[in-house]
Amino acid sequence: MGRGLLLVLWGWMVLWSVLSGRLDLLLRGVFHSLVGASGAALITAGLLLVFLHRSARKVIRWPWLVCAAMGSLVLLIPPNPSFSDLASNRPQGLPEPAELAFVLPPEQRSLTEWVRLLRSQPDPQLVDGNPVNISGFVWRQPEGPPLIARLTVRCCLADATPSGLVVAWPADAYPKANQWLAIKGQMTVGERNGESTAVVEPSAIKPIPRPKRPLEP
């Protein structure tokens, strides 16, 4: 019976992660239904075990108590990943760009779409003066000013790759690592590591809450 209750607890933990939106911080949305089905299956299996062994009396083993405590902690303590730290420990790289990203008007491109465009057309002069309307988290760099960045995933945080844009931060701006910002402005041409690069010149910077789904495909 104890094993059945443990399965119910862990099944509810998985299902609650989907329903509460916590899973959006860890996994691409396309996989959420599969995870939700797994949680429902665990609950069903647990209830079945409880029903079949409802009259049996067994000593509750300490590993079961540890698992139950861990499941309870996961339910009580929401995940709070540091995207800036994760980005600093991951290689940069993006999947092949979608054609749509290149035909969108500049002000409609997301940060990731801008990065893909600039990698396919590395001459920053081609985008000089283009309007920019992006959002992302502040990614601290070992040297130089922080970037504005997003994480892209194929499946989950384990395969996340960062993509960032250089920003000409105003003198009175003090962006904090992991802070989410919405930036409006235009693309200009600057220099980074001795090479010409596209630089976002902000006309407006606004702190925003972390998006419901911060990971991009």
Regions found by a protein language model. Give the residues of each.
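Membrane-interface segments at or immediately adjacent to transmembrane helices
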Residues: P78-V138
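N-terminal amphipathic alpha-helix initiation
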Residues: M1-G4, W169
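OB-fold single-stranded nucleic acid-binding module
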Residues: R22-L26, S84-D85, P91, D123, ...
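Domain-scale activation on soluble regions of proteins
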Residues: G21, L27-F31, A41, S55-R61, ...
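Internal/C-terminal transmembrane anchor helices
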Residues: R57-F83
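Membrane-embedded alpha-helical segments of integral membrane proteins
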Residues: R3-S55, V59-I60
